[in-house]
Swiss-Prot record:
InterPro entries: Lgt. Keywords: Cell inner membrane, Cell membrane, Membrane, Transferase, Transmembrane, Transmembrane helix. This is Phosphatidylglycerol--prolipoprotein diacylglyceryl transferase. GO terms for molecular function: phosphatidylglycerol-prolipoprotein diacylglyceryl transferase activity. It comes from the Bacteria. It holds the Pfam family LGT. It is found in: Cell inner membrane. Its EC number is 2.5.1.145. One of its GO terms (biological process) is lipoprotein biosynthetic process. The gene is lgt. One of its GO terms (cellular component) is plasma membrane. Catalyzes the transfer of the diacylglyceryl group from phosphatidylglycerol to the sulfhydryl group of the N-terminal cysteine of a prolipoprotein, the first step in the formation of mature lipoproteins. A 1,2-diacyl-sn-glycero-3-phospho-(1'-sn-glycerol) binds at residue 154. Belongs to the Lgt family.
């Protein structure tokens, strides 16, 4: 019965070319642009925060805004290398262990946010220690602007018709070109809204109204917690990766497994930030 009802209530997939433009053999994709926009926005926004002295403890930013100019390359390497290695290890290890030459082929798709955040975290730690910057404040500076990039990349996932959701009869379900004959949740857009719009707005309020940058580690903790919760919610609507399927009980996915520790780590980071600030008061 549901199969006969689904076609009448679903939306056609918008025919948007994943390639924005080509210059000879070079093709610029929406997905790649999403990463560039995300990194550049976090760079610009981080510098804006560092110039606003009143936001920081003792009105003293942890670094000069110009320090982020040097960090951009570190961030790009952390995102790309971490994202790719994370995808290989978490989502398709058996394939890549048999086809190691395919590991560097990021242009064929396959990036993990959880791997990307681990790679970026390592880059931030190494950069901060090499420049004498407090690591927790480095985390905060970058985390505050990351949701914008997440939102843009998720929209690019939608344009690419990838990472779509489970079969659904909701009025806004979409027929994806490679998603089979039945309409599905546009779960990429759910993620763009929760991980991008909502999470950025929450962090914006914590930074500019709550003045939480005065508590090193709080904003980073809020970001990690917010992302983890958002991802867990969306995983109930998102189709699990074909090569993994459900890990348990027809509902548990790899995305959930990787996100639960993020929530716990984020809550701990916020608790630690509050506790440390209270001791220093």
């Amino acid at each position: 019965m549901i199969e006969t009802l689904l076609p009448a209530s679903a939306l056609a997939f918008p025919n948007i070319d994943p390639v924005i433009f080509r210059v000879g053999p070079l093709a610029v994709h929406w997905y790649g642009l999403g990463y560039v926009v995300g990194i550049m926005f976090a760079w610009w926004y981080g510098k804006k925060l560092l110039r606003s002295h009143r936001l920081w403890a003792n009105n003293q930013p942890p670094m000069a805004p110009e320090a982020l100019d040097d960090f951009v390359i570190w961030a790009a390497l952390g995102v790309v290398l971490g994202g790719r290695i994370g995808y290989v290890l978490f989502y398709n290890f058996s394939y890549y262990i048999s086809n190691p030459l395919a590991i560097p082929a990021v242009w064929d798709g396959g990036m993990s946010f959880h791997g990307g955040i681990l790679g970026t975290t390592l880059a931030m730690i190494l950069f901060a220690r090499s420049r004498g910057i407090k690591v927790w404040s480095m985390f905060d500076t970058i985390a505050a602007g990351v949701p914008v990039g997440l939102g843009v990349v998720r929209v690019a996932n939608f344009i690419n018709s990838e990472l779509w959701g489970r079969v659904s009869d909701v009025p806004w379900a979409v027929y994806f070109p490679n998603g089979g004959p039945l309409p599905r949740h546009p779960s990429q857009l759910y993620e763009a809204f929760l991980e991008g719009v909502v999470l950025f707005f929450v962090l914006f309020l914590l930074v500019w109204v709550g003045r939480k940058l005065k508590k090193p580690g709080f904003i980073a903790g809020a970001f990690v917690t917010g992302y983890g919760l958002s991802r867990i919610v969306v995983e109930f609507f998102r189709e699990p990766d074909a090569q993994l399927g459900y890990l348990f009980g027809g509902w548990l996915t790899m995305g959930m497994v990787l996100s639960v520790p993020m929530v716990l780590i984020g809550l701990w980071a916020m608790w630690r930030a509050n506790r440390t600030a209270a001791k220093d008061a």
